[in-house]
Amino acid sequence: MKKCRYCKKQFQPITTLQKNCFDPNCVTEWINEVKQKNWQKKKAKLKLDLMTLSDYIKLAQQVFNKWINLRDKGLPCISCDKPINGRVNASHYFNANNHWNVRFNEFNVHSSCITCNQYLSGNLIEYRSRLINKIGIEQLTLLELEANKTRKFTIDELKQIINKYKLKIKQYEHNEL
């Protein structure tokens, strides 16, 4: 005997997977639940199909920034070297809107306090000196060369970036536990 998922009465199931009795109200609730689940799946697929290139860029940037903030968790601000208390920004050394080629480059983006990133426009003079200490002058030179190249991302490339950083976030969070 099993207990019905909806009316909580005892019933004899026909199969081991059956979770509700054959009362018309319970069957109706079960059918509505199945329809709702199917609609949610269909809606999610439709939403993905309607996403534009700019939607994928925004999503890729959100996932990438989340990864940067997790990677740099506990480190001081890259620009002012003060401990980051509260909200954190993923600060781009080369502006993300003007230098598309290094927009998702991990050497170009580091955690920064809101004061430096938003109110001091990245505090770039201090950022550069600390960036040299962090990644080295050779890597910074390569980054500067890459930054001057032009690039346009395709939706498939952005999907790969999203999946790559979602996986990194998942692995990081799994290792944290």
Question: Which residues are covered by each model-predicted region?
Answer:
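A boundary/linker detector
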Residues: 1-63, 151-177
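Short, cysteine/histidine-rich loop/knuckle motifs that typically chelate Zn2+
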Residues: 6, 23-25, 78-81, 115
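Residue-level signal for mature regions of secreted extracellular proteins and peptides
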Residues: 14, 19, 70-73, 106
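Short cysteine/histidine-rich metal-coordination sites, predominantly Zn2+-binding motifs
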Residues: 20-25, 38-44, 92-100, 128-136
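Short Cys/His-centered divalent metal-binding micro-motifs
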Residues: 25-32, 85, 109-136
